[in-house]
């Protein structure tokens, strides 16, 4: 059977079928990728440029490789056969044009594309939307030259400290409120237990709100890095002028303080000089008065008087009289005043003797009083 099929294929009298004639009449150049007609090329370029304007991929692959589903398999076979012929055939007259790629759209740098309008975003902010509230407050308080670059979650220590400050004041605040409205509470809730329950319920509600605040604060972000725009010439000039003015004011203030210190030093020196001159004058006046008094007074009194006025120093206090008496009367002091003169036993014995003498004196006084009392009535009876 296989031999019969080979004979039919190799025989020259076999007729061509309709399918073979249709394939021969087709122009393979119309289905080649490397040879493109001018009109089709313009249509493809216009289609690609319009797609680029709508921010789609730079190449419209579906437009370039648009093939019907029914003819997809046959055309792929023809294209493969055409490529093989181009590779095998060496024809100098055949011209294959270069593949032209459509021009790409240049990348454009767009700043703040993901940022919303500042005023419109923060016009109506919910009080529980902490994320937007924090951004709004930072935007209002920071100057225009400051820009926040990075945002991060708040730390646990920051959150715990903030919540502790609120929770520690809840009980104190509730007590102050109940004290302030004590009369109204007594009218509405005369029972103390009901007031206590009301207080507990209010405190629990406040604690619940603080818990919700903590949960929402965990989701917020705070700025971690700020960039200062120092390239604004007006800002740099204004900042330089303010620094100059402040530096000048500080210099003037320092000079004023120095001048004040110099004046105070001069005043102190003048006071010291006045004090020294007054002391010298006072000493001269006192010495003159003492010299006049010493003429009419005893020499020992004049020395004592001069000592009372402080004109004689302690080093110059003389004991000439004592030394003279010591020589005249042969005085010798053997006692050591650094040690106690009497021992404890002697002191105790002396104390006992003094007590006994005091007791004896009291007895003598009592006896004398009794005797005098007995003698007085006898005198009256004799009379």
Curated annotation (Swiss-Prot):
Extent of Basic and acidic residues compositional bias: 77-87
UniProt KW Cell division keyword: yes
UniProt-annotated location(s): Nucleus; Chromosome, Centromere, Kinetochore
Annotated stretches, region: CTF19-MCM21 binding motif: 318-337
Keyword Nucleotide-binding carried by entry: no
Region (Interaction with NKP1-NKP2): 350-383
Keywords: Cell cycle, Cell division, Centromere, Chromosome, Coiled coil, Kinetochore, Meiosis, Mitosis, Nucleus
One GO-annotated biological process of the protein: cell division
Region (Disordered): 1-24, 77-102
Coiled coil (UniProt feature): 244-274
Region (Interaction with AME1): 234-264
Assembly: Component of the heterotetrameric kinetochore subcomplex COMA, which consists of AME1, CTF19, MCM21 and OKP1. The COMA subcomplex is part of a larger constitutive centromere-associated network (CCAN) (also known as central kinetochore CTF19 complex in yeast). COMA binds the centromeric nucleosome-binding protein MIF2, and to the outer kinetochore MIND subcomplex. OKP1 interacts directly with AME1, with an NKP1-NKP2 dimer, and with CTF19-MCM21.
Family the UniProt entry places it in: Belongs to the CENP-Q/OKP1 family.
Function: Component of the kinetochore, a multiprotein complex that assembles on centromeric DNA and attaches chromosomes to spindle microtubules, mediating chromosome segregation and sister chromatid segregation during meiosis and mitosis. Component of the inner kinetochore COMA subcomplex, which connects centromere-associated proteins and the outer kinetochore. COMA interacts with other inner kinetochore proteins to form the inner kinetochore constitutive centromere-associated network (CCAN), which serves as a structural platform for outer kinetochore assembly.
Name the record gives this protein: Inner kinetochore subunit OKP1
Species of origin: Kluyveromyces lactis (strain ATCC 8585 / CBS 2359 / DSM 70799 / NBRC 1267 / NRRL Y-1140 / WM37) (Yeast)
């Amino acid at each position: 059977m296989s031999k019969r099929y080979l004979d039919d294929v190799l025989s020259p009298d076999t007729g061509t079928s309709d399918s073979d004639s249709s394939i021969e009449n087709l122009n393979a150049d119309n289905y080649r990728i490397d040879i493109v007609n001018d009109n089709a090329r313009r249509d493809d370029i216009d289609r690609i440029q319009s797609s680029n304007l709508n921010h789609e991929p730079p190449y419209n692959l579906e437009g370039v490789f648009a093939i019907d589903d029914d003819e997809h398999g046959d055309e792929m076979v023809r294209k493969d056969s055409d490529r093989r012929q181009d590779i095998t055939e060496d024809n100098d007259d055949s011209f294959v044009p270069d593949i032209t790629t459509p021009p790409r759209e240049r990348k454009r740098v767009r700043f703040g594309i993901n940022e919303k309008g500042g005023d419109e975003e923060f016009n109506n902010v919910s009080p529980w939307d902490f994320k937007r509230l924090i951004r709004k407050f930072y935007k209002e308080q920071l100057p225009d030259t400051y820009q926040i670059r990075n945002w991060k979650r708040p730390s646990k220590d920051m959150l715990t400290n903030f919540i502790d400050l609120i929770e520690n004041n809840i009980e104190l605040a509730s007590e102050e409120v109940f004290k302030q409205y004590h009369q109204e509470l007594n009218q509405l809730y005369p029972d103390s237990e009901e007031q206590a329950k009301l207080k507990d319920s209010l405190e629990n509600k406040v604690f619940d709100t603080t818990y919700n605040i903590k949960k929402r604060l965990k989701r917020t972000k705070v700025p971690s890095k700020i960039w200062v725009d120092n390239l604004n010439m007006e800002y740099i000039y204004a900042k330089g002028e303010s620094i100059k003015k402040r530096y000048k004011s500080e210099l003037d203030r320092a000079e004023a303080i120095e001048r004040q210190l110099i004046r105070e030093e001069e005043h102190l020196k003048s006071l010291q000089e006045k004090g020294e001159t007054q002391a010298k004058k006072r000493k001269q006046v006192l010495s003159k008065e003492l010299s006049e008094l010493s003429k009419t007074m005893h020499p020992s009194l004049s020395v004592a008087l001069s000592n009372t006025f402080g004109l004689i120093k302690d080093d110059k206090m003389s004991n000439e009289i004592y030394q003279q008496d010591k020589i005249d009367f042969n005085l010798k002091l053997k006692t050591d005043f650094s040690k106690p003169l009497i021992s404890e036993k002697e002191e105790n014995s002396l104390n006992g003797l003094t007590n006994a003498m005091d007791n004896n004196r009291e007895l003598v006084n009592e006896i004398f009083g009794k005797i005098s009392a007995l003698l007085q009535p006898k005198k009256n009876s004799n009379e």
